Amino acid sequence: MRTKAAGCAERRPLQPRTEAAAAPAGRAMPSEYTYVKLRSDCSRPSLQWYTRAQSKMRRPSLLLKDILKCTLLVFGVWILYILKLNYTTEECDMKKMHYVDPDHVKRAQKYAQQVLQKECRPKFAKTSMALLFEHRYSVDLLPFVQKAPKDSEAESKYDPPFGFRKFSSKVQTLLELLPEHDLPEHLKAKTCRRCVVIGSGGILHGLELGHTLNQFDVVIRLNSAPVEGYSEHVGNKTTIRMTYPEGAPLSDLEYYSNDLFVAVLFKSVDFNWLQAMVKKETLPFWVRLFFWKQVAEKIPLQPKHFRILNPVIIKETAFDILQYSEPQSRFWGRDKNVPTIGVIAVVLATHLCDEVSLAGFGYDLNQPRTPLHYFDSQCMAAMNFQTMHNVTTETKFLLKLVKEGVVKDLSGGIDREF
């Protein structure tokens, strides 16, 4: 026996009628085409079906609310992270902090001049690094990414900044825009090159080493460390400005027409930013949202002056020399396995130059009230709030280089030799 609902589930077969009943007034005569019981004629659905439908309709609404909550949570954590990166406990009084003993200034200047007056030793830095770290240092490593590079297992194994896994097409696109990928010819022609890597340390202020620093063949400056207004202490010659997007100087005054801009690429949008800088294009607003601070809108240099740092140098610095653990997948942040730009630049210098000197390096965390940088009022205590770099391990590494005579410390922030 069929129920009424079941009867409504199918149409009755059409059967022609031989005799038509008289139609009431005002109604159409039924025909073989109207003698069908449609679904719309059936009774309303049962209460059980209606309840299920209401439940299904509520599910998407609940899902949207959950997604919104997660989005707001992530955004809130991101804001707190940005605030933490830019937070410092206090500012130092620069007038009081920058007094330097005149005798100390004279000794520092004399020592720096002695370093320059000695005969340059070809391949000294590479040879010394190879002896000190053996198989952990490669003497054949190229400093910059080449247009037709040798196959590198390390480069394809790691994500930025240690390699270019999944970014090979972006790298090739950038290299097509860059006509040169090595040191300029006038520097390559030198039989023996002296490098100085100038850090941002407050110890530089007052030493008046600017004139001496300008005499090095290759002067490497880091991030946005300024020259304008500080040339007496840090010089005004720049051969290489090495930085990542957020660290690049915002002022055109910090760029000279013959500088090399060496880009260190950490994340996907860094590739977009560098391409925009080379092509003199405006970076889209949505791309800017992925940087943790304001980035330069233009770099006033020609394409031939841009270089891309070989990421294997960062890999060599982090995993081989400093022996940090390899990167692990994390939901938020990074392990402390990313070296500072300064230490990466020191290793780069050993691949570029025959002799290497340092100035403006050294974090004395036992003196929290001393100036962190030569150009601002941040105190050394601010280093206690950074979470990306292992300052203790890096300090031991630099001290080892100075003690073994691989590099010279001109400002005495790592180990004073004067």
From Swiss-Prot:
Tissue expression: Ubiquitous. High expression in brain, skeletal muscle, placenta, and testis. mRNA widely distributed in human brain, but slightly elevated expression was observed in the cerebral cortex, temporal lobe, and putamen.
Q: Which residues lie on this side of the membrane: Lumenal?
A: 83-418
This chain is glycosylated at 86, 236, 390
Q: What's its EC?
A: 2.4.3.9
Task: Indicate yes or no for the key word NAD.
Answer: no
Q: How is it modified after translation?
A: N-glycosylated.
Could you name the domain of life of the organism this protein comes from?
A: Eukaryota
Which parts of the chain span the membrane according to its record? 62-82
Query: Region entry Disordered: which residue ranges?
Result: 1-25
> If you read the UniProt record, what top EC class would you report for this enzyme, in one word?
transferase
Q: Which cysteines are joined by disulfide bonds?
A: 195-353
Q: Which residues lie on this side of the membrane: Cytoplasmic?
A: 1-61
Q: How does it sit in the membrane?
A: Single-pass type II membrane protein
Pfam annotation, one family: Glyco_transf_29
What is the disorder linked to it?
Answer: Salt and pepper developmental regression syndrome: A rare autosomal recessive disorder characterized by infantile onset of severe, recurrent and refractory seizures, failure to thrive, psychomotor delay, developmental stagnation, and cortical blindness. Deafness is observed in some patients. Affected individuals have patches of skin hypo- or hyperpigmentation on the trunk, face, and extremities.
**Which function does this protein serve?**
Transfers the sialyl group (N-acetyl-alpha-neuraminyl or NeuAc) from CMP-NeuAc to the non-reducing terminal galactose (Gal) of glycosphingolipids forming gangliosides (important molecules involved in the regulation of multiple cellular processes, including cell proliferation and differentiation, apoptosis, embryogenesis, development, and oncogenesis).
Q: What is this protein called?
A: Lactosylceramide alpha-2,3-sialyltransferase
* Gene that specifies this protein: ST3GAL5
